[in-house]
């Protein structure tokens, strides 16, 4: 079951409050390992699910961005596991823009379970044309920055 809303919350201690998008994910049995906890590799996938839902919600879906001739691959990702989660846990995945230039976008994620932070991370994306060459998003798709919360 997936659903989302958008309160304003800080993403990491010391960060400014920003428009926070919240995506919810219920942990499936197949996402757990032999020890009964959510396998660590799933957190990167949860980040992607939340990012795609967030882009859809702000009107800048990957399909729309790609129709403008822009691709945005992940060029970096990092995370910290703070607590385990298990089958049937309901996760709240908070998404927030950490920083942006014309060529890169850094997105922060905080994953909570029952109000407790269980994971913090970020993904870094660049902007390329369809031939894989760097491009300035402000020149190719200027409304993208305006759509960001």
Label the model's feature ranges.
Residues 54-100, 104-105, 126:
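Hydrophobic beta-strand-centered segment that forms part of the acyl-chain substrate-binding groove
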Residues 25-29, 81, 127:
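Hydrophobic residues in beta-strands and at strand termini
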Residues 3-6, 12-56:
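Catalytic strand-loop segment that frames the active site of acyl-thioester-processing enzymes
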Residues 43-46, 73, 108, 124:
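Residue-level recognition of specific faces of alpha-helices
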Residues 3-4, 12, 20-23, 56, ...:
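HotDog/MaoC-like acyl-thioester-processing domains
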